[in-house]
Amino acid sequence: MTVTTTKHEALRRALIAAAFACPVAIIAPALAQAKTVLRISTPAVPDDWHVKMLYVFKDELARAVPGRFDVQVHHSGTLFRQGAEAVAMQRGNLDMALLSMQDIARQIPEYSIFTAGYLIRDPDHLAKVYGGPIGEELSRTIAETMGIQLLQAVYLGTRQVSLAQPRRVRTPADLAGVKLRMPGSKEWLFLGQALGANPTPLAFTEVYLGLKTGTIDGQDNPLPTLKSAKLYEVTRQIVLTGHLVDVLQLAISSKAWNALPSGDKAEVKKAAAKAAKFNDENRVREEKELIEFFRAQGIEITTPDVEAFRKTVQAAYLKSEYAEKWPRGLLERINATR
């Protein structure tokens, strides 16, 4: 073998090695950069604890499994309008959302029980109902029926009635004729009717202008939402009805959920729990502090006959077509949860 032959052989081997190495060099960075994208939609505004909570969720995942997820938070209803998220998830157009029980009841009518006024007593009762056996049954049914996996129940707040112009409100009869903004589903509108008002459907993003122009006379939301969305600027009175201790469900589509390895699923659940804890603690704290803040803004704070509201609202639900579909014994189990 000559020196020339040896050189040619060495060159041939080098070229073959390079040919095999190039695809690896190209593929390896691509694999390293591959992330699971999770797009989350919420109607909440940036200052709301729910949006802040979603960034806690994002940060917790980034810390626990660096580089594995690309969590994209779309706030203020910019991706999907309020109430459209569940269907978007089912169609594969959205990965995650904060779903209301009203959204769920539209597809599973027997769960309208969870939309009933004066059902949940307080945030602690809420956590025990949704964090216990009832919540587990709820999650299984929703996964099987809707193709959506519930990750964590999240405290929305205790809903109060706020009015653009003050009026005497002691009982539901005093809300007769009041155009009370509610989200657009029939479950929400029924609640407004049960309160004695004239429920008026309006998108959350339009509530501020609606109060300002008189399109609506009032709206119902938890106090932290009143502040974060600056609705207090067009509010003259808050009536402390406390008619709904409200929950949202941080949820993920089954399509996105089933695509995750078991280890990633565990980290997603942990991140959801930590995010919910952050939200719940801050909302409970802020609800206690905001009464004085609103008084300082010149808003009249009034306490009605809550028992009169409770009896009227509960009677309306028990006589409705909704109650006919409630699972047997579930109301008693919710009431008995301590």
Label each PLM-derived region with a short phrase:
Residues V3-A19, P23-A30:
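Twin-arginine (Tat) signal peptide motif
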Residues E9, A17-F20, Q33-L126, I134, ...:
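N-terminal secretory/targeting leader peptides
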